[in-house]
């Protein structure tokens, strides 16, 4: 049997063609003693097809908690006995968060809300927030506001939203084990409308929710079909009071194999370290990930969990001589 890393070197590194679902599964099934070779190849692919720059992003929760959906990993669902309570962020605080994010060298600031989809009040708050940020901060603005209608997509585009995040979360075949209050197809439809409106598509998910390696490979293939600009990779950080609160944290070696496998399946895509990497990988794993296919990071804290200090990530990038991607858009 031909070694999958030899195949990947020719197919992905040389020709720039991502691995298919079966090939990605073979990568995920590699023994731990092949991990270093796998990470080295994924890093070569990232450097060849994406370059050395790392995009830095900050995120902020405009509306926290009280969500009517039942995403089993999420402490912001109003259906679970989690400690997160519903709250709104005021515009001055939103602007200050954008300023602090820009000071890290970040080029992207994502406004997030825990909702099924935005209502008029939320859209008005987003519009006011974007206008206020643009008046004071030189940064690109992304949004993550749940599922959208065609009208809402167009309005966000008109507001100047640069990129829209809506995660598929997991493989299509596993989705009903994670969410029952809406469908995978509804999420997919929103992403297609976002693309058609000219916004960049940001779509990833969470690894370690009980999916099989086969489903992890399926998820990579789902994303390859979607072909988003960016894929954020989260690792489950089990939240008390949620249906997934008692799941085990993904082993670090398994998480790193997934990072590298997704890079080999998506050679030209921005692959971002997102939530859960602190408890799954720790400091050493963060370095291995950035040298194993990752080319974007979220700095600072996440929506309901603490992240690594921004200074730690920025120092790591400096130590590794990875330049931070510069802001080059006209805002």
From Swiss-Prot:
Pathway: Cofactor biosynthesis; biotin biosynthesis; biotin from 7,8-diaminononanoate: step 2/2. Its cofactor is [4Fe-4S] cluster; [2Fe-2S] cluster. It comes from the Bacteria. Keywords: 2Fe-2S, 4Fe-4S, Biotin biosynthesis, Iron, Iron-sulfur, Metal-binding, S-adenosyl-L-methionine, Transferase. [4Fe-4S] cluster binds at residues 67, 71, 74. It catalyses: (4R,5S)-dethiobiotin + (sulfur carrier)-SH + 2 reduced [2Fe-2S]-[ferredoxin] + 2 S-adenosyl-L-methionine = (sulfur carrier)-H + biotin + 2 5'-deoxyadenosine + 2 L-methionine + 2 oxidized [2Fe-2S]-[ferredoxin]. One of its GO terms (molecular function) is iron ion binding. GO terms for biological process: biotin biosynthetic process. Its EC number is 2.8.1.6. It is an enzyme of class 2 (transferase). SMART domains: BATS, Elp3. Binds 1 [4Fe-4S] cluster. The cluster is coordinated with 3 cysteines and an exchangeable S-adenosyl-L-methionine. Binds 1 [2Fe-2S] cluster. The cluster is coordinated with 3 cysteines and 1 arginine. Belongs to the radical SAM superfamily. Biotin synthase family. Catalyzes the conversion of dethiobiotin (DTB) to biotin by the insertion of a sulfur atom into dethiobiotin via a radical-based mechanism. This is Biotin synthase. It comes from Mycolicibacterium vanbaalenii (strain DSM 7251 / JCM 13017 / BCRC 16820 / KCTC 9966 / NRRL B-24157 / PYR-1) (Mycobacterium vanbaalenii).
């Amino acid at each position: 049997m031909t070694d999958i890393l030899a195949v990947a070197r020719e197919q992905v590194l040389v020709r720039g063609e991502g691995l298919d679902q079966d090939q990605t599964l073979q990568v995920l099934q590699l023994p731990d003693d092949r991990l270093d070779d796998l990470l080295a190849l994924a890093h070569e692919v990232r450097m060849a097809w994406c370059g050395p720059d790392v995009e830095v992003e900050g995120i902020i929760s405009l509306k926290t908690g009280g969500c009517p959906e039942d995403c089993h990993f999420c402490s912001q669902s109003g259906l679970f006995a989690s400690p997160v309570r519903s709250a709104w962020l005021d515009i001055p605080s939103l602007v200050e968060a954008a300023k602090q994010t820009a000071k890290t060298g970040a080029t992207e600031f994502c406004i997030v809300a825990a909702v099924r989809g935005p209502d008029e009040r939320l859209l008005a708050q987003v519009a006011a927030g974007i206008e206020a940020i643009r008046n004071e901060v030189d940064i690109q603005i992304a949004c993550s506001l749940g599922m959208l209608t065609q009208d809402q997509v167009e309005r966000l585009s008109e507001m100047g939203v640069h990129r829209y995040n809506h995660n598929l979360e997991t493989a299509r075949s596993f989705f009903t084990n994670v969410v029952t209050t809406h469908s995978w197809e509804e999420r997919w439809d929103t992403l297609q409308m976002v693309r058609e409106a000219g916004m960049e598509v940001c779509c990833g998910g969470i690894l370690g929710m009980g999916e099989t390696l086969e489903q992890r490979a399926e998820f990579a293939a789902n994303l390859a079909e979607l072909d988003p600009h960016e894929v954020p990779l989260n690792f489950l950080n089990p939240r008390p009071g949620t249906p997934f609160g008692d799941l085990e944290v993904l082993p670090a070696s398994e998480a790193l194999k997934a990072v590298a496998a997704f890079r080999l399946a998506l050679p030209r895509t921005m692959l971002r370290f997102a939530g859960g990497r602190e408890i799954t990988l720790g400091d050493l794993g963060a370095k291995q990930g950035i040298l194993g296919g990752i080319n974007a990071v979220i700095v600072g804290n996440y929506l309901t969990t603490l992240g690594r200090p921004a200074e730690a990530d920025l120092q790591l990038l400096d130590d590794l001589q990875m330049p931070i991607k510069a802001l080059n858009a006209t805002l």
